[in-house]
């Protein structure tokens, strides 16, 4: 169990016994309490996680109850996410990328996977959306969803391999794009979140060697590529159990202009990561603890930083195993140098264009 005061930087860690943990030496204040553990059962490893935010710990003997959920560890995990962009004077954001890694010992197929940025509140979090759907707590919601192509066996990902989804799979280090300020060349990405070459806001978005994704849901303002918040957001990787409809969207009963979306069953989600704009964002988290019990933040927008998953261990063959406790606060760290395939992640065999 971890008790964190993000205002003071104070962190107290303790262990549980029979589901109960006791902590001493806590200075009165407002804390976030997170719990994480793992358990093996039936040949599978389950992650147990939960959190409570805005917990006032004032008097001795205060008790806090944290609800926890158990989720089977996923084979595919977000390994690194670069969302901040660069150049605050010119707001360069087209170099965003999402690296997804096979953390298991079995081959996994990327065909048909979907990726989305979820919504749960208005911009300043003063309105938490109320969705008029039965069992709303069993869903997360997204305005835009992109899907990988394939027939089910087209894109194998071996253990230790990763694939990269680029917003735009070009060399962003180019002077004519980011004035040389971007840290990444994305020409080796496996997929890009554009459907075809187009011009947007006066910029020619070229169709590159990376495989085009399909925008299967567009419930909000239409853009030809996938831009997520440079302040951080809530990212989900999922495999839909039924076809996604690009119509008949759900609108929150207290919606503003962002409150129309498509529901995603939590049971379909493979991995989720939560990033907030700063420590104050920890007070209102948008993902259920069954998906992510924590969050992380970079030093700001347009600062050229990424978030990367920590290494848990290395297998005898040199393949890395990444930490996955379903708690981004524990599992990720901020990096000043966004990198594709950090720590030696391998390239899928079907990416034949990476060295062209």
What are the roles of these predicted feature ranges?
Residues 1-8, 108-112:
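Short, ordered, surface-exposed loop/turn motifs in non-cytosolic proteins
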Residues 4-9, 45-50, 129-152:
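Short beta-strand and strand-turn-strand segments in soluble, beta-rich domains
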Residues 6-21:
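Short, acidic Ser/Thr/Gly-rich low-complexity loop/linker segments typical of extracellular
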Residues 11, 38-67:
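Structured interaction patches on ligand/partner-binding surfaces of diverse proteins
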Residues 21-23, 62-64, 163:
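Short strand-edge motifs at loop-to-beta-strand transitions and within beta-strands
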Residues 27-42:
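A short, solvent-exposed beta-strand micro-motif common in secreted/extracellular proteins
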Residues 68-122, 215-234, 238-253, 313-315, ...:
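A structural motif detector for short, solvent-exposed N-terminal "entry" segments of globular domains
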Residues 136-340, 355:
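Solvent-exposed beta-edge/loop recognition patches
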